[in-house]
Amino acid sequence: MVQQTFTGRKRVRKFFGHIREVAEMPNLIEVQKASYDQFLMVDEPEGGRLDEGLQAVFKSVFPINDFSGTSQLEFVRYEFEAPKYDVDECRQRGMTYAAPLKVTLRLIVFDIDEETAAKSVKDIKEQDVYMGDIPLMTMNGTFVVNGTERVIVSQMHRSPGVFFDHDKGKTHSSGKLLFAARVIPYRGSWLDIEFDAKDIVFARIDRRRKIPVTSLMFALGLDGEEILSTFYKKIIYKRAKSGSNADGWRVPYDPVRFRGYSTLNDLIDADSGKVVLEAGKKLTVRAARQLQEKGLKALRMSDEELVGMYLAEDLVNPKTGEIYAEAGEEITEKSLKALNEHGYKELPLLDIDHVNVGPYIRNTLSADKNLTREDALFDIYRVMRPGEPPTLESAQNMFQSLFFDSERYDLSAVGRVKMNMRLDLDAPDTYRTLRKEDILAVIKTLVDLRDGKGEIDDIDHLGNRRVRSVGELMENQYRVGLLRMERAIKERMSSVDIDTVMPQDLINAKPAAAAVREFFGSSQLSQFMDQTNPLSEITHKRRLSALGPGGLTRERAGFEVRDVHPTHYGRICPIETPEGPNIGLINSLATFARVNKYGFVETPYRKVKDGRVTDEVVYLSAMEEGRYHVAQANLPLDNRGRFTEDLVVCRHAGEVLPVTSDKVDFMDVSPKQLVSVAAALIPFLENDDANRALMGSNMQRQAVPLVRAEAPFVGTGMEGVVARDSGAAIAARRSGIIDQIDATRVVIRATEDLDPTKSGVDIYRLMKYQRSNQSTCINQRPLVKVGDVVKKGDIIADGPSTDLGELALGRNVLVAFMPWNGYNFEDSILLSERIVKEDVFTSIHIEEFEVMARDTKLGPEEITRDIPNVSEEALKNLDEAGIVYIGAEVRAGDILVGKITPKGESPMTPEEKLLRAIFGEKASDVRDTSLRVPPGVQGTIVEVRVFNRHGVDKDERALAIEREEIERLAKDRDDEQAILDRNVYGRLADLLENRQGIAGPKGFKKDTKITRSVIEEYPKSQWWLFASPNDKLMAEIEAMRKQYDESKKGLEQRFLDKVEKLQRGDELPPGVMKMVKVFVAVKRKIQPGDKMAGRHGNKGVVSKIVPIEDMPFLEDGTHADIVLNPLGVPSRMNVGQILETHLGWACAGLGRRIGQAVDAYLASAKQETKPLKETLKKVYGDNETIKSLNDHELVELGRNLSRGVPIATPVFDGAKEADIEQMLELAGMDKSGQSTVYDGRTGDTFDRKVTVGYIYMLKLHHLVDDKIHARSIGPYSLVTQQPLGGKAQFGGQRFGEMEVWALEAYGAAYTLQEMLTVKSDDVAGRTKVYEAIVRGDDTFEAGIPESFNVLVKEMRSLGLNVDLHNSKIGSATPTSEAAE
């Protein structure tokens, strides 16, 4: 049940879920915060920081040695200083919220002995060096960069490690599977090992030319024999003793090796000489085992059966050293004969049978042209650096640096762990480079795959993809910056006199700071935060993108990468992803998912012990989960937590299968752990088609915050969580009592967590009518009254789109599903005028306009009211500084800020000179460049900000704004001071009361009792003078006084700092003297053309707004608010909206009954609450919260419920059909959920009953006002002289090829000619038309379109001279005048 919170008592949701939630849902923006905290590690722990995050970056780059080795620059530690501006100041001033990074460096200078070359330390210097600013994360997981909020999206990429794959038979025409292995490091060169069609194994480094894999092994220091002994077993064939059962070779018998063996000759037992298998038969696995059981020890092989085998060692004459045959050589009849002649009694052969073991490595070895390590190294050098002559040393160094140098190659801890798991190795995860053993293990595993042992990897398995969050992305970026810096430092260390410099002189922090700035400013993963509503903020922070640097590109990403994978369960939402080219590449984290320290996504499960489900929660990654059987959360359990059914359907290794209940290892914690936050907000999600659910999730993020937010009647129980975690609603930081409150701030006197070092007062500033990134309105309003008691975590103020601490994206409206005169054809929506009149779907949008006054070559621009050629009427909204008043109503074309710019001197006519001489300097040398309201905007000025460059005099307006701000700061300081005084002096009086007084203020009698009345005779500041013989008491009072003085001083200091910041000039871009920002609030009522949607992907456009009296109405005279087309449901299969409608209808009915009970209570003389309590009990059953309320709270609750009883129906565990019917019955309504409806215009009943109920509708951010656009004349393109396109450019409508065909088909010749000439790019013609229209004349002539001239110019650029001859028709001689 909802815990007893301050808002939870004001509105109680009836909960339909049956499954008890065991795990707490993690904070929804934890992904961002935890990752960045781990990177920064702001507070240095005892014993220094661990090697991760920023510390690891510094450790990896430092120490830096100079080229000669005489000096070394070491990293000691780093710390952050306090940020210069706080978050709000950064937003207002367009700054970046960042903290300066201070690094302590140590420069060590060595003395080097000339003869012994021994080093001794000559000098050590330590110094703190400023290393640029590092952006800080705000409380809500965002960054403020240049005044705008940005989010760094987490990236999904391929985990480092080793992957085995095949080409699916696409490379070779035969369809043969070519296997390949790829070692992917975190940074460094990729190593590919692959088969070709002839079964030779090759290696590639960084996708370059391939080299035989044996060359790679030579370079690793193996020779031919070692290579063969690594990959193949050795079998000794012994010459049978001549004379016993004819000549031949004796072979030890191994049933595993001989299974599947096809015989050419009879198989003969070497000891008994009996035939064990006739020629031409195949030895089955069973038969092979039986032969061993019968005691078969060895087989006899004839000479010809050895032909085609391979030697395992070089065969050498021990006396002469002559090599008869080399290791890996194939035995031929000729070579066998020679060996027999030399009298070899034993032959070591390779165990290659072409069935279980293939000769791939042996074949590669024989095909390899390189025979020694040197050749192989040279070959690799030539591949990596073609065109450079190799030397042995350079080749060795290059090969060493490719895979074995920690500077150049890093597998990362993840890569090492993955590699160990895949190849069964046990290297520690601190070992981050490749080892010889790793490369050999990869080749072995690959060869085994080719031999049919083992499985290839699934690249889309979440065990093979990991998440890089903010911290890690930032770490990589900062490392890049430091490496750039390192080069510069090395050069500087060599070029300066090292004995006299300090670390400060060696370091230039610009490259590091630039790398950070570049990352936040222009990386693909640093995105402008989607701030339309709280849900869109949260979703943006929980987004996982496969795009971005080091990731995929849209074009390259195939179908498999985008698809839903079984391992997504509980980790990545299968529903929420964009439609369009990014589908499946951008995903959302599931509700309970979290990212572990290795970057793999984990999901929680309940542990099952001995068939009993416990409450112990374990987080598993995709790799770990594959080993277990996991049951669903909605399985029925008995009261002891055992499964009621014997067979349980489980997920195991990507399959779904029924198993007995004792085999189950884990169980899901919640049914909604499968989906993301946005999908978990859709009630009856289980009744919607997945495609529509996807649209529903995506459209909730586009819902515009309305003027009056209203929580949904039918919710899912997630609404409160989203409102709290997004930071839209304000939660109390500590428990306390509300002390003061107004529209802009709430002051709470803390009663718990009282820390003597902090003030006992929390002041919460509310955001009033601020502009969000998407121009929607951010406005917070308090929910508490003075004297209310709140607990830590209670919601004390609602934000945009929240209602009593719950997410409220839209409004509950009365819907009728029926056609209405074709106005809801094709998903159109018909609305009642009530919705416009009562501002149900009205939203406020705040537009920001800015103007800068720069210093130009001709003189400074000026912001002023004195503008040339502008009437007084147009200046009526401006103050004396030329800036618009707050509260002024403005419309398109009005001046917001007057500005004049100096004009270049144009040559004067004699008349002008004369006038200038007579009247002196005239204002003709400036032009009007004022900021005006753009077309399509009209509204009210809500805020003006003026920024001045340092040293520029502030105008009256800027000073007024400054004064206002200082007053506000002073009020904050005084309030905090007053509460501090009240607290401290109250405690002091309590301590002193009834004590023996041995001293006191002037006039206090010694050794008398200190009573409350005595204390209060004196001013508070003198209370500290009282003294008592109790030393312990006096020590406490002294500590209190010290603390009080410090707090007081701190308050004053903070106030002075802020004032100083206000009065200091602003940091403006170069050349800008002054900047003014004006904010205009636009009120947008809903109108035809606006897009609306429900939560089930049921979207539509408003087609008509009908007078209330014309809307269909019910028997009690209630008119429907909205009419939707019933045909929108069946084909789209989003039946959730119908269930929501029925349930909403029941909620409203129950709300009405509770409302009647409240009215009865207020009307009755006795004011008896029993009937109200009984009504509530019928609805809610035995609810703890309701039982605990007093009469006053009960009535408030009843009032809040009278519009409708809110209910929660969680996804996959919500209300069933029976529950809905029961609710309808309880509300005294028809169980069918349908009602008789009358036509508003005729009063007749409609033939059949109509589904009527309450549905939650959203108004989306696609408003017709932002899209509608018209132009008569405007800007033209430079080259073609055609009008520009698009609303932003104030462009025209394109009249394209097909439209031209239409006019041609109608034969509208004159219209067509206008379209192609005077209305487009006939420059002279269009001017003439304009003049003609102004004159009231309607004759004009079309000339030559500019595009013709462009064509002529293009042909000339190709060397074809084209001349255009203008000639009147009928004249004999054409005039040879080219049209230029």
From Swiss-Prot:
It catalyses: RNA(n) + a ribonucleoside 5'-triphosphate = RNA(n+1) + diphosphate. The gene is rpoB. Its EC number is 2.7.7.6. One of its GO terms (cellular component) is DNA-directed RNA polymerase complex. Belongs to the RNA polymerase beta chain family. NCBIfam families: PRK00405.1, rpoB. DNA-dependent RNA polymerase catalyzes the transcription of DNA into RNA using the four ribonucleoside triphosphates as substrates. It comes from Nitrobacter hamburgensis (strain DSM 10229 / NCIMB 13809 / X14). Pfam families: RNA_pol_Rpb2_1, RNA_pol_Rpb2_2, RNA_pol_Rpb2_3, RNA_pol_Rpb2_45, RNA_pol_Rpb2_6, RNA_pol_Rpb2_7. InterPro entries: DNA-dir_RNA_pol_bsu_ext_1_sf, DNA-dir_RNA_pol_bsu_external_1, DNA-dir_RNA_pol_su2, DNA-dir_RNAP_su2_dom, DNA-dir_RNAP_su2_hyb_sf, RNA_pol_bsu_bac, RNA_pol_bsu_CS, RNA_pol_bsu_protrusion. Coiled coil: none annotated. It comes from the Bacteria. One of its GO terms (molecular function) is ribonucleoside binding. Keywords: DNA-directed RNA polymerase, Nucleotidyltransferase, Transcription, Transferase. This is DNA-directed RNA polymerase subunit beta. One of its GO terms (biological process) is DNA-templated transcription. The RNAP catalytic core consists of 2 alpha, 1 beta, 1 beta' and 1 omega subunit. When a sigma factor is associated with the core the holoenzyme is formed, which can initiate transcription.
